[in-house]
Amino acid sequence: VRDAYIAQNYNCVYTCFKNDYCNDICTKNGAXXGYC
């Protein structure tokens, strides 16, 4: 399961094109990691 998809409430719910951006915004929103 990739973090870019809503699969679990702690996963990244943002579609990301760059892993660093995804990780940054996801961790700010409480995810453990936001990498796709």
Curated annotation (Swiss-Prot):
GO MF annotations, alphabetized: sodium channel inhibitor activity; toxin activity
Coarse class of the protein's main subcellular location: secreted
Annotated keywords: Disulfide bond, Ion channel impairing toxin, Neurotoxin, Secreted, Toxin, Voltage-gated sodium channel impairing toxin
GO cellular component: extracellular region
Keyword Nucleotide-binding: no
PROSITE patterns assigned to the protein according to its UniProt record, in alphabetical order: LCN_CSAB
CDD domains the UniProt entry points to: neurotoxins_LC_scorpion
Similarity comment text for this entry: Belongs to the long (4 C-C) scorpion toxin superfamily. Sodium channel inhibitor family. Alpha subfamily.
Functional note: Binds to sodium channels (Nav) and inhibits the inactivation of the activated channels, thereby blocking neuronal transmission.
Domain note: Has the structural arrangement of an alpha-helix connected to antiparallel beta-sheets by disulfide bonds (CS-alpha/beta).
Protein name: Neurotoxin 8
Organism from which the protein derives: Buthus occitanus tunetanus (Common European scorpion)
